[in-house]
Regions:
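Hydrophobic transmembrane alpha-helices of Major Facilitator Superfamily
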Residues: 19-21, 87, 91, 103-111
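Membrane-helix interface residues
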Residues: 35, 64-66, 127
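C-terminal ends and interior cores of transmembrane alpha-helices
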Residues: 76-90, 94-95
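Cytoplasmic helix-loop-helix junction between adjacent transmembrane helices
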Residues: 99-140
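Residue-level signature of mid-helix packing/kink "hotspots" within the transmembrane helices
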Residues: 48-56, 141-149
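Helix-loop boundary and gating motifs at the non-cytosolic
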Residues: 1-53, 84-86, 98-100
């Protein structure tokens, strides 16, 4: 794959992976299906705890099985989480949903930068890394700002 196509694909991944279009309305959805504030914020607390606890193991796993594989695993777990919740709108359903999202985000968090770095290193294009990483993060942020405003 040519460098330009690779960077376009990488930026698209960063843009779409971080969208999470449901975030601005999810609190209201949880309230409407019967969760109270204590339950909602307990789930959020567990999400952040699980995310932090999974950071090191998933980083190690990414180094062991490959960063690209972890990007795929992160994407699959995010898809499963978002398919899961409409069929399980309960406290335990939301808890599983957010644990899967924590797993997904921990798979991708360091693996995406490492994958970009490794790919550019293999192509002898490391001088492009800072700009490519910056653009990818900008596209991720741009997606959130524009799309969340529309939701």
């Amino acid at each position: 794959m040519k460098l330009k196509k690779f960077l376009l694909t990488f930026n698209a991944f960063q843009f779409f992976f971080s969208l999470l279009l449901w975030v601005p309305i999810f609190y209201e959805y949880q309230k409407r299906v019967g969760l109270n504030d204590t339950e909602i914020f307990r789930i959020q607390s567990i999400y952040y705890l699980v995310f932090c606890l999974l950071e090191i193991p998933t980083g190690y796993l990414a180094d062991w099985i490959g960063h690209r594989v972890c990007l795929i695993l992160g994407s699959v777990s995010l898809i499963v989480a978002n398919i899961w919740i409409p069929f399980n709108p309960s406290y335990s359903g939301f808890l599983i949903h957010f644990i899967l999202i924590a797993l997904s985000r921990s798979f991708v968090s360091g693996a995406s930068s490492a994958y970009l770095y490794e790919t550019l290193h293999q192509r002898n294009e490391l001088d492009e890394y800072k700009e490519a990483e910056g653009k990818a993060r900008a596209y991720s942020l741009l997606g959130k700002v524009i799309c969340w405003a529309l939701v």
